[in-house]
Amino acid sequence: MSNIQLWMTPKRDMTVFFPLLHIIILTGMNTQDFASAYFGMLGDWRLMHWLIIGIHCVVLLFLTTCIQHFRFIFLPLYGIDWTSMALWAALLMQLAYLLDYADWYSWFNHSTVWYLMGTILITLSAILHRMMHVRHPYINPRVFSGFRYVKHILLLVCLFEWLFATEHILEEIFLEEVMHYSTITNAAFSLPVWTGNVAGCIFSLWWLQKVMRMSYIRLGIVGSLMLFAYLVMMYLMVSPSLSIEMLYLPLFCRGFAYTTLSIVFMASLHDVMDFNHFFQGLSVFNMIHMVIGGCMGCALY
């Protein structure tokens, strides 16, 4: 996506790039869920693997035949803190395991949880030590303390990920265990979610470019209201007599809210940080967005 960024926006306007980026990513994610379910119904689940292999072969064939072979000057990867990178990865795996399986272990009534907490503290201490004493750490401490609003943005990301955990707890348990919907029926729900994703991207692009340029707070309020509407509908509409059609609107609201809030947080982070630290801040953002926030929300529920 970075290679074709200038095709999308020659001025590198992130309020244009981020909405278009989310359309491509979320379309692929929803299509994958839909395709894997139907391949499993029509034939064999291995067909999805063959499809992915075929797509990769087409991409490699295109790169071989249509792209000019050109390389920039070789730059050695000196000065990268590989040890801290491994420690951050280990910390994420430890936190994900703790938050996912602590309930199965009955939390602090089992010795495994206490051992895991001890290893998490050791890993975190090693990360903080290297962050303060290594010349070029993997995540610079200035990411958290050198820019205004970064900590507020990361805290809001974590909070909203907790709220989105309803999708994994209430929605999935209700649809699978109470309503006993099949895999195909659950896969069909990807369509209203995808529609909400695309609508959220187009609305965010229109809002930031035409209505109130750079007005992230108001756009964030719109996304928050859509998330609140999804949560209220999912809590109040839960009933064994619920029809499938009644689920389309809350699922649309979830897709719209997820996309809008993601664009707001990424664009806000880009504006408050300089180029040298933005990708480190983006790494922390994705750690919370993709791993810690959702796992913590599920654990709290």
Where are these regions (language model features)?
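Transmembrane-helix bundle of Major Facilitator Superfamily
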Residues: 1-60, 247-253
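Cytoplasmic-side transmembrane-helix entry/capping segments in multi-pass membrane proteins
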Residues: 13-24, 77-86, 143-145, 216-222
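Alpha-helical transmembrane segments of multi-pass secondary-active solute transporters
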Residues: 17, 47-52, 112-116, 186, ...
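Structural signature of transmembrane alpha-helices in multi-pass secondary transporters
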Residues: 17-29, 84, 88, 160, ...
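Interfacial helix-cap and linker-helix signal at transmembrane-aqueous boundaries
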Residues: 34-44, 99, 175-176, 207-208, ...
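Membrane-interface helix termini and inter-helical loops of multi-pass transporters
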Residues: 39-41, 72-74, 99-109, 173-181, ...
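Hydrophobic transmembrane-helix bundles of small-molecule transporters
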Residues: 43-154
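12-transmembrane solute porter fold
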Residues: 139-301
